[in-house]
């Protein structure tokens, strides 16, 4: 939320188990939605999947960590246990396929990961392109996705983490806010 506030955009933080689609639509009336990290699976993340299904064709959406997984699952992807659990670990991310949220970032950058779940790459719906990967045990792990038709993005890593370069994390958030 702090990186968003730094762009001058007002922020409303809502708990996924203490709000409703109706409240979001009729009272909050957001111009964009960020679905943030959390300690559970998309199935346990309150209304996150419902929010994605309701707003994906109406508003830009960015999912971070659990939000990224929720986006994948909302469109039919399968969330699986990661081969390597990453909590507070810095990894090298790729910047692929000219995503708007990675505009101005180098082709490789370091970011912090806190997760034990990932989107199974074999299940990634065809309506998404991969915009970032990392390697775990010489295998690609999806670190970023972008919908082919709507401004819906997910990043498995944490742009807001102290272990992610502040310049890169802020750039991702400001790129999203400027959509």
Predicted regions, residues:
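Short gly/ser/thr-rich secondary-structure transition/capping motifs
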Residues: 10-18, 42, 94-95, 111-114, ...
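Conserved beta-strand segments of alpha/beta enzyme cores
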Residues: 10-12, 60, 78, 110, ...
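Cysteine-nucleophile active-site neighborhood
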Residues: 27-104, 110
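Histidine-centered divalent metal-coordination motifs
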Residues: 65, 115, 158
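Catalytic beta-strand/loop cores that center a nucleophilic Ser/Cys/Thr
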Residues: 99-150
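A glycine-centered loop/beta-turn motif at secondary-structure junctions
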Residues: 135-179
């Amino acid at each position: 939320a702090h990186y968003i506030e730094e762009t001058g955009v007002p922020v409303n933080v809502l708990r996924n188990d203490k709000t409703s689609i109706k409240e979001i639509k009729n009272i909050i009336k957001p111009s964009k939605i960020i679905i943030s990290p959390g300690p559970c699976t998309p199935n346990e993340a309150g209304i996150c999947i419902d929010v994605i299904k309701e707003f994906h064709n109406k508003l830009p959406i960015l999912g971070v960590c659990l939000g990224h997984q929720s986006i994948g699952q909302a469109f039919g992807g399968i969330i699986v246990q990661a081969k390597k659990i990453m909590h507070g670990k810095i990894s090298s991310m790729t910047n692929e396929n000219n995503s708007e949220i990675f505009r101005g970032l180098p082709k490789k950058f370091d970011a912090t990961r806190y997760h034990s779940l990932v989107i199974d790459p074999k299940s990634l719906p065809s309506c998404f392109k991969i915009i970032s990967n990392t390697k775990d045990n010489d295998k690609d792990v999806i670190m970023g996705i972008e919908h082919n038709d709507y401004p819906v993005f997910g990043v498995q890593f944490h742009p807001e983490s102290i272990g992610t370069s502040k310049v890169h994390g802020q750039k991702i958030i400001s790129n999203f806010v400027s959509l």
